[in-house]
Structures are given as structure tokens and as C-alpha cells.
Amino acid sequence: MKHPGLSIINILTVLTVLTSCSCNQDRQNNWGIPDKEQELPGSETAVPEEIAYDCTVTVDASSFVSEDYIGNGVQWDPYEVNDISDTDWQKLYNRLDFMKPQFIRMMHNIGEKTVNGALIKEAGLEHLMHLLDYCQSRGITVMFGDWGGSIADPEKGTINETLLRNIAEYLDFLINTKGYDCIKYYNLINEPNGYWSQTKGDYDLWSHAVKFFWEEARKLGLDKKIKMAAPDVAIWTAEETFWVSNTVRDFPEATGIYDIHTYPSKITVNSGQYTDIIKAYKDASAPGSKIVMGEIGFKYQEPEDAGYHAENLKRAANLAHASTEDSQMFVYDYMYGTDMADAVFQTINAGYSGCVAWMLDDAMHYKEPGKLKIWGFWNIFGDERYGAEHETVRPWFYAWSLLCRYIPKGTDFYTVNVSGTDGIKAIAGVHDGKRTIAVVNVSKEEKTVKITSDNLGNMDNVRKYIYGEGLFVTEGDCTMHPVATDMDFSLSKGEILKLPAESMILLTEL
């Protein structure tokens, strides 16, 4: 598969665009790339006021859809395959330092640390400490959890009390002995509503396990250090909100955040139907509480996306180490970055407080012997085992990085209204008085967008980023440059921007 990204061809493509743009006296775009001392001509943002626009993005700074946002981040689990070299660990850290994830979900299996009922605390600890040390040193909020293997027996309707005690003891070890107070939330049993889960969709069995575990955690004083993240269900429709409402009823003190997982189809998100689905779960959560997207990714299951589904299977079948059952092969395409942005924007505007992308690295999980789940931003064992091209950062890393590093923990999001055309979504937030606005165009056509606000005020010293194929330049292994800096915006008058097809623009004072 041809791999897009950091090639000289990509850079030359951008320079060609810049050259053609500099000749256009009407300044039809603003794709200039600044160097260390000055910006190249053509890096201005707004197109002339007289140019017609397709839609209006209106920001209401007097109204908020989500406050004190936890942040966006990634699923980062202890690696199941091979040992990682010091060089690769440093590469992982450097890439994450550019992304700046605010929120990480991290899962394990307590059964792998239990021998004849006894907890072996050091089992697998070396790998896990690499992850937790990083999160602790960067102040990242961690949602830790157990996949659920052997914790419950759905045939007998029983729970494994030994394993549940060991989970509480292991958490006590990590938090109180090892000092990992970055762990703020705990997930018990991944996606308990699913037929693939250890509880096979039995709410009563899951709640029995949670009650027993939480009592064991309380005995150790852990209730003062962590809260539950629940119910952690995977949903595709609005028909399973009872999992959230029952959690509100049964675990009002134990639950710190509500969480769900979504793997929507492209048409579901791009059409806006996704908002209606996820809003139902927000509405089912406790008033004043937070709810997060504990996993988010795309699966092309709707009839309208049959072409994407077929292409996904074809690509997986043509890659020797890819699982055809559980891979998202469009992570190699720029489109996946804009689709993920679309989903996140709708999630934020529906009142959620965080999103965790599935997943960081292909190398974390086998689906079957010799077959990996291809979902990540890269495969850190590419050079050693799978081919150097797979270790290279994939395009959607840059889109997701913008939505992590420029949406820091504690961001408040304003109400945003988009009118005039389909395919455009937007968010607007503020952190410590500094504003960020992002707009995504998921359509196959260029769109002209007017951004306006009666009460947001002017934006000063703005950096502008644009994500899309051929629209930005990277440096080194993973650094993305803004296309312009030190810009000013008068939103009371309105600013008009052009968004190429399948692109995202982010404007930030941060």
C-alpha cells in the first residue's frame, strides 16, 4: 500500500500550491508556511469580504455546551507483542509529546497477574511502568481498567471474588505504593453489554461485579483516590441508554464519570445523525455529571458505506499482518482524520467531556496468531518486523494531535451554530482566556465558511493550522507547522475562510 505522509513528494505538492496561490491577487487561500523568522507571502487567513460563502459558523460566547473538559487522548495499553527497544520507547514519547494527549485509557487483565489465586504484582510491571511513568510525568488523566477475562461467569451468573479482590489490591499497589495518582478512574469489564464481553450483555451480572469490587476498593481507602468510569458500553443506536440510567440509579457515589464506546459508520457521523444517538446517553447520565467517549473509531456497517467496507476488507486482506476481522485500513488516508474530527466535534457539542481514540499503536494487540489490529497512528515494530513504512506516522495523527494539544484539560466550549450547507461542523472553546476555533469540512468539495460572533471579541496573535492532503508541511519525525502565525480576527465583522475538501482548520490563541 502506498503510504501518504512525510515524503518529499508531499512537500513539493504543498510548495506547488503555494506558488500558484501567490499569483492569485484575490488571495483565494492562506496556505503559506512560516519559517522561523517570517511568514511566506500568501499566509493571510481571510478571503475578501465580497466573496460569497457557503455557510455561517456562529459562536455564542454567553452559552456553553461543555465545561471543564477532561480532554482528548488515546487508548494506550501494555504491549502484547515483543519487547520495545529504548530507541522505540523514546520515539513513542516524542510523538506523544507533540500530540499532548490529555486523557488516556489503559487496560489490563488481572488474570495474567494471578497465580493459584495469589496476586503477582510484578507480573508485566516493567511494560506498564513505561506507560504510567509517562502519564504521571505529563499530568495526563488515566482511566485504568480490566478487560474482564474470567471476572464473571455468564453461564452460572457468578462473579470471581478472588480476581475482584486482586484488582482492588493491585490498584492500591499502583496508586499508594508506586505513587501513580494519575489514575483517576477505573473501568471494570470492557463493553459489558456486548455478546463478546465476559458478561454477555447481562446488566445484573455486571453490576454485581462492580458492587463487590467497589466495596473491596473502599476497604482499602481507594474510594478517596479514584472513581468508577461506567458503564463502558459499546453502542450503535440510542436503544441501550438503560445501561447509563441504571448506573446512575445503582452507583451514584462510586461513579465519577459515565462512559460509552462508539464505532459509527461514516454516513452516520457525516450526516449528523450521530449527534442524536450520543445525545441520548448524555441525557441519561446524572445531572451535572460528566460523560466521555471511552473509545471512538469508525466501522463501515451502514449500506451507504458498503464501498468503504469492501475497500477496507480488500486492504486488510492484502496486508499479511492485518486482521480482516478487526482492522481500520483507512487510517492510512487523510479522510480518516477529518472523519474523526467530525465525530469529536459532535461529541463535544452534545455535552461530552472527553474522547479516547482507538488506538495509539498497531503493535499493542493481536486479534489472532500473526494478525494485528490495524487501528493505530503507527506500528512501533515496523522497522524491526513489519516494514519501515508502517512505523511512519500516519496522516490522522496530525488531525488528532491538534484536537489534543489545543484542547487542554479544563477547556470550556461555547455554543456553536452552523447553517447554510451540509458537511461542515465546528467547535469553539476557551482555556485561561485564550480561544480556539476549529472547523472541519468532510465533503468532497471546497467550502467557503464565514465565522462570526457578537460576543466573543477579537482573536489576537492567532496561529492557524490546516489539516488535509497536501495542505501542510511536517518537520522531522512528527512535527506539524502552522500555516500562519500572529494573525488577528475580527469575529464581530466576520471572517471568511476557504476549506478545501476533506480538510480541517484550527485557529488558536494558545
Regions found by a protein language model. Give the residues of each.
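Active-site neighborhood of divalent metal-dependent phosphoester/pyrophosphate hydrolases
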Residues: 189-191
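Acidic/histidine-rich catalytic cores of soluble enzymes
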Residues: 196, 258, 264
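Bacterial N-terminal signal peptides
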Residues: 10-20
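Non-catalytic accessory regions flanking glycosidase/transglycosidase catalytic cores in CAZymes
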Residues: 23-185, 194-195, 200-237, 249-254, ...
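Bacterial N-terminal signal peptides that target proteins for export
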Residues: 1-9
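Active-site rim elements
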Residues: 327-335, 378-391
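Catalytic-core region of carbohydrate-active enzymes that cleave or remodel glycosidic bonds
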Residues: 265-370, 403
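Catalytic cores of carbohydrate-active enzymes
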Residues: 228-230, 242, 255-261
